[in-house]
């Protein structure tokens, strides 16, 4: 049946602005972009005259983690909604980091909105490990997470 997660799609309002954020601030590697349109695209997205810019960014060359797919709808207005962690949806995308304190400072230096400073958690009694985590937002307000495990 299912084999693996191929990519994680994020609908954005401005693909160039989002590419700069995910590439220049978060350090993902830009892999390329394309435009999707035509009858197959209309069918896949269940929209008429659908035209979408897509871009792929990756955090690893050997794709041990699924790439991020950015989508900007050209012919259809993007419906804005305020992302919330307690809303029934995909709540966040989590990125593993080696030094969360340094990455946190980097985000602040780049005027990225963070929901908190890094917080430490101990889930060893539940069979998991210890970690530090924080939530932050991309240019469209999409909630992302950083986690350092130890």
Per-range role (PLM):
Residues 65-68, 90, 144-146:
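Short, structured motif recognition centered on aromatic/hydrophobic residues
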Residues 3-7, 52, 88-92, 131:
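Short, solvent-exposed beta-strand edge segments and adjacent coil->beta transition regions
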Residues 38-43, 76-81, 121-127:
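A short, acidic/glycine-rich surface segment
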Residues 68-72, 83-85:
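Helix-adjacent hinge/juxtasegments
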Residues 11-64, 127-129:
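Core segments of cupin and vicinal oxygen chelate
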Residues 10, 33, 94-150:
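Vicinal oxygen chelate
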Residues 56-58, 72, 96, 135:
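Short, well-ordered beta-strand micro-motif
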Residues 72-75, 149-150:
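Acetyl-CoA-dependent GNAT
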């Amino acid at each position: 049946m299912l084999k693996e997660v191929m990519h994680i799609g994020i609908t954005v309002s401005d693909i160039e602005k989002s590419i700069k954020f995910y590439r220049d601030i978060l350090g993902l590697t830009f892999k390329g972009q394309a435009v999707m349109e035509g009858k197959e695209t209309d069918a896949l997205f269940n929209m008429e005259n659908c035209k979408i810019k897509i871009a792929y960014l990756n955090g690893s060359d050997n794709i041990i983690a699924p790439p991020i797919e950015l989508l900007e709808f050209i012919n259809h207005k993007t419906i804005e909604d305020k992302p919330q962690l307690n809303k029934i949806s995909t709540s966040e995308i989590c990125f593993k980091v080696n030094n969360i304190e340094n990455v946190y400072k980097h985000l602040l230096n780049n005027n990225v909105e963070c929901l908190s400073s890094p917080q430490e958690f101990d889930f060893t009694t539940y069979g998991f490990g210890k970690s530090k985590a924080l939530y932050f937002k991309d240019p469209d307000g999409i909630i992302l997470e950083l986690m350092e495990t130890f």
